[in-house]
């Protein structure tokens, strides 16, 4: 008589995630849109007997602690809600996203935790549910949608944990410069300065500019961006908290700078450079963009303002399109 062999539980394979930074609001598209750009939170996870983390890059003292870690907290909470035990993990984190500076660091961390829970907990979650859960935890869907899907994300909440999302691949080249001040700005503080009511004129202007902004990205119309970035709903009220913004907005339409907006609620500022800018010898391409970036650096020095300037660009690949995640879904 043959005896049945017990099936061994299949070990869950390691997972690697690459989550881009995101910039929400983009001037007039307040609480409605976000853009993914090329700074990344990279997470490698392997099943283990106990939790441990190694971290490199920006803010390793925050990214490398196990206690109160946003990725691990989210991971545990999602699995607990699903009635599953949290498999201990060894994480290696490589972080390039400024933390607490309006660049979507919390959305990236929460999405990482959710993705780890889905993978190691063997949850059958769709992209929509992953983005919805991250949006519920973030209290708005723009950063989460752009981080997971890439490109330009237009999003709204349609329930407590349901997000309606449309993603657009911007046409053409969109070089960016990110100005990051030394001090962080809590989102709660940036929210407190906003008015409770707006005039019809201001609301209409923002709707018009949001439509122009969308058209600029869809059609690759850089010429529309200078006027399309005007906002009347949040940036005028936050300018006192983010002195980089009014200084950099003065460059809009000149010196190869298309415009500047708060990244999220600030204090970082996202600067759109003209991909067709020319250098002093009439050369375009990288030379022209580099000259525009140098103009920004010189302007900040002349204004007596200090900030780290990071050259980057829009990225159309979100965490949900990464090789490791795509492989596990195939």
Model regions: which residues?
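DPxDG-like acidic metal-binding loop motif
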Residues: 39, 103-126, 148-150
């Amino acid at each position: 008589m043959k005896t049945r062999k017990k099936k061994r539980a299949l070990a869950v394979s390691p997972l690697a995630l690459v989550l881009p930074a995101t910039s929400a609001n983009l001037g007039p598209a307040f609480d409605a849109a976000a853009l993914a750009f090329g700074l990344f939170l990279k997470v490698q996870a392997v099943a283990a007997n106990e939790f441990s983390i190694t971290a490199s890059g920006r803010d390793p003292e925050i990214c490398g602690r196990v206690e109160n870690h946003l990725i691990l907290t989210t991971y545990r909470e999602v699995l607990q809600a699903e009635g599953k035990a949290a498999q201990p993990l060894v994480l290696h984190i490589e972080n390039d996203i400024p933390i607490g500076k309006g660049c979507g660091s919390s959305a990236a961390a929460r999405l990482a935790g959710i993705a780890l829970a889905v993978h190691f907990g063997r949850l059958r979650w769709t992209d929509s549910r992953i983005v919805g859960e991250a949006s519920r935890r973030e209290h708005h869907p723009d950063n989460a949608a752009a981080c997971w899907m890439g490109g330009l994300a237009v999003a709204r909440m349609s329930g407590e944990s349901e997000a309606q999302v449309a993603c657009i691949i911007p046409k053409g080249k969109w070089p960016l410069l990110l100005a990051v001040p030394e001090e962080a700005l809590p989102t709660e503080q940036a929210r407190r300065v906003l008015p409770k009511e707006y005039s019809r004129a201001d609301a209409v202007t923002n709707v018009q500019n949001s439509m122009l902004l969308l058209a600029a990205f869809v059609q690759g119309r850089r010429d529309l961006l200078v006027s399309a970035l005007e906002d009347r709903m949040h940036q005028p009220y936050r300018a006192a908290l983010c002195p980089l913004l009014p200084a950099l907005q003065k460059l809009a339409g000149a010196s190869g700078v298309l415009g500047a907006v708060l990244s999220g609620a600030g204090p970082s500022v996202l600067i759109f450079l003209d991909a067709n800018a020319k250098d002093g010898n009439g050369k375009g391409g990288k030379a022209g963009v580099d000259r525009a970036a140098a103009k920004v650096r010189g302007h900040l020095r002349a204004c007596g303002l200090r900030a780290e300037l990071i050259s980057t660009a829009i990225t159309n690949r979100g965490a949900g399109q990464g090789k490791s995640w795509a492989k596990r879904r195939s």
